[in-house]
């Protein structure tokens, strides 16, 4: 059969096959838009990112300021951890028991106070520019390090995928695989099973037709949409055939007691799924949690919902990884795009404050039981060991053995550094 013998119906059937009827125009257009201690050996290291979108308040979490002046001081106090001299916010009692496993960076600093661009900066190491979208470090990791098996090297939970989490000019091959929300009832990842009434013989026939169509349309494709669709299609086929993938995503096989320990929340079950994925060889898993932009009603929301969810999930993840002997080869990062203002506003909230904020890094050969850097008494500014965003991203690449001085070619042929300069990897996290 050649292309000219296709009927309209045959062609539509091929189109439907690409994602078994689930690849819609919006997804196609999105792909089109995306197209323009003793450290472990880099090849053995995996990363789990707990991404707190909106801007976590450092006052109520990792950098409490009980001596801050009135109007700045949190309504919640600080508590000791299992490491002498280190305190965290009182809403993190479970995490406080594991301080020996993590480093608190209290001196992150940036100038970007806008959510979208600040997230893009924190997830790429590039200050955003209007003319160019930069790849996330998850996508760079997927490109630079070979997949360990048939599972995607970069997986994201809590979708939908934002543009700053994508591969940009590296191409759709390195976009994250979206695992949706594992806390949903009857959770199931799409594309892991054949649709009802479709067998492998039918799939193979349609796959042959699709390859034939691809050859023709690739000649007319100037923006990479065919490559994008083909990448998504081939990923789907690979996962459907993979028993490893089915096993990895089967979160319901976990003991009920363990699921409850992580917390029956999107963040908690996302962390549990991340552990399962890393256990099966996935290199980078991003667990996204939204709702951290507390301009209003900070103290009620962060005490009744957000920080208890984080505390439970993070502590359970560290304990689980440690008990399974995986913490040494799994780096866990608790990240956010910026901090919150020292001054409490009239709405009982805090506004955006990139000048001084906190991150946490655990495992992956990073020594625990310490803090890095410091802010002043009211957390207006960093007063000790400032760490800039590109410094932190360079550190991640260094841990993975990725050359962070290399140059890429953008989609318009322009040379682009993998990270904005100047930067310096954080040596305290490498030794």
Model-derived regions, located:
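Ligand-binding pockets and gating/stacking loops
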Residues: 1-431
């Amino acid at each position: 059969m050649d292309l000219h013998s296709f009927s309209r119906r045959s062609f539509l059937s091929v189109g439907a096959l690409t994602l078994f009827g689930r690849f819609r125009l919006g997804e196609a257009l999105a792909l089109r838009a995306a197209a323009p201690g003793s450290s472990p050996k880099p090849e053995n290291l995996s990363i789990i990112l707990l991404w707190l979108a909106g801007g976590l308040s450092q006052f109520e979490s990792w950098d409490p300021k009980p001596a801050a002046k009135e109007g700045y001081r949190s309504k919640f106090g600080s508590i000791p951890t299992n490491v002498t001299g280190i305190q965290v916010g009182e809403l993190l009692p479970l995490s406080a028991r594991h301080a020996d496993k993590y480093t608190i960076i209290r001196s992150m600093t940036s100038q970007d106070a806008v959510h979208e661009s600040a997230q893009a900066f924190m997830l790429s190491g590039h200050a955003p520019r209007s003319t160019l979208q930069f790849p996330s470090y998850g996508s760079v990791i997927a490109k630079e390090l070979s997949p360990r098996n048939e599972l995607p090297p970069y997986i994201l939970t809590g979708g939908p995928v934002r543009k700053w989490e994508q591969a940009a000019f590296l191409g759709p091959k390195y976009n994250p695989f979206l695992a949706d929300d594992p806390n949903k009832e009857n959770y199931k990842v799409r594309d892991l099973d054949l649709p009802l009434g479709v067998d492998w013989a039918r799939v193979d026939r349609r796959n042959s037709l699709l390859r034939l169509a691809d050859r023709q349309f690739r000649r007319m494709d100037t923006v990479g949409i065919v490559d994008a669709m083909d990448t998504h299609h081939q990923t789907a086929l690979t996962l459907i055939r993979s028993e490893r993938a089915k096993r990895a995503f089967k979160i319901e096989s976990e003991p009920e007691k363990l699921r409850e320990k992580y917390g029956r929340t999107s963040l908690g079950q996302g962390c549990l799924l991340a552990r399962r994925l890393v256990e099966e060889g996935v290199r980078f898993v991003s667990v996204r949690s939204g709702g951290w932009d507390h301009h209003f009603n900070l103290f009620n929301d962060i005490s009744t919902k957000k920080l208890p969810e984080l505390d439970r999930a993070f502590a359970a993840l560290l304990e689980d990884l440690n008990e399974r002997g995986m913490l040494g080869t799994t780096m866990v990062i608790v990240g956010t795009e910026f901090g919150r203002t020292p001054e409490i506003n009239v709405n009982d909230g805090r506004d955006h404050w990139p000048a001084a904020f906190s991150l946490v890094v655990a495992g992956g050969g990073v020594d625990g039981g310490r803090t890095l850097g410091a802010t002043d008494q009211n957390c207006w500014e960093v007063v000790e060991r400032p760490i800039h965003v590109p410094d932190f991203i360079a550190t991640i690449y260094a841990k993975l053995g990725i050359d962070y001085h290399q140059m890429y070619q953008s989609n318009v042929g322009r040379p682009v550094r993998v990270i904005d300069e100047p930067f310096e990897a954080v040596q305290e996290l490498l030794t």
